[in-house]
Amino acid sequence: YSKIIFENNNMPTLLKYESISDRLIILEGWSKTYCMTGWRLGWSVWPKKIYDFANKLCVNDHSCPNSISQYAGIEALKGSQEEVIKISKEFEKRKDFIYEKLNSMERIKCFKPGGAFYAFPNISDTKMTGKKFAELALETHGVAVVPGTSFGDSVNDFIRLSYANSIENIEKAIYRLSKI
């Protein structure tokens, strides 16, 4: 998601913090930035002390993307980045829309996302856990959201919504969620 950032934010890099370099793993790929989900291309940075282990793990798990994917990835990097900028601007419009709509709901509070295409609102005022809210949203309103606990126990009263969809569909989903 490092290229899908909003409001002139710069993507910070943890590589500049030497004090954590011995336990820092960075993963990046082409999936989101270049709309190449499923092509299975990416890169990583590992600490020297676990590099050999990581290399053994990766070589047997995911080290052989096909040549078509590799050439497409090279072209994505070498080519014009105008489409990446265009897509990022579209996601920014959707972010502004979903942020405004979520915060207009009586029992939902949402911070403005700084990048990517997910909103992560706090739903604690609904008196439901994120898991219960997600189940209810899907079963009774046909809207799929992810409970916050998928990202750790400390966000039990949050949900994650994707805004990688049209404004029209986002509006329909928010309307349905407002009925919960």
Cite the ranges covered by each PLM segment.
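PLP-dependent class I/II
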Residues: Y1-I180
